[in-house]
Amino acid sequence: MNKQPEEWQDPQSLQQQDDEQDEIIWVSKSEIKRDAETLKQLGVELVSLGKNALEKIPLDDDLRCAIALAQRIKREGQRRQIQLIGKMLRARDPEPIQQALDKLKNRHNQQITLFHKLEILRDKLLAQGDDAIAQVLEHYPQADRQQLRALVRNAQKEKAAKKPPKTARQLYQYLHTLSEAD
């Protein structure tokens, strides 16, 4: 069959041929392997989660069962099961799963940051006394001044007497309830 020179063909057929050539996207084997490894790591993270955390992630029943099985088995069987989970994730859209997992991690990091801030605030209350109480009352106007002063005073007495920090823990819990109410 003789092929016609390009100048003899109509412009629309040339445009269609160019579009078909543009649609072909070559993906290297290394990139495919990297993507597969990323999805396998996502599977490892899913297997390491607890039951309550897994309920918050949008998974279908097959994937949920595969993850539950991977959590029950050990060593080589678990490795193979994680590879299967990675393969199952390749057939699905992993983006919503990754977003839910990131949201869970972020919430955990926010809680840790809050705990550290409250511990610093408690230590500041024990060190500075009334000045720090005034700052806490500005930040948390719903706080009970008398209860806060009593907790600080008792925690300072315990610290001076080298007793276990029972009241300091109560002060921390009180600050935690204030931050939750805020």
From Swiss-Prot:
One of its GO terms (biological process) is assembly of large subunit precursor of preribosome. The gene is darP. This is Dual-action ribosomal maturation protein DarP. It comes from the Bacteria. One of its GO terms (molecular function) is rRNA binding. Pfam families: DarP. Residues 1-20 are annotated as: Disordered. InterPro entries: DarP (IPR006839), DarP_sf (IPR023153). It is found in: Cytoplasm. Keywords: Cytoplasm, Ribosome biogenesis, RNA-binding, rRNA-binding. NCBIfam families: PRK05255.1-1. It comes from Sodalis glossinidius (strain morsitans).
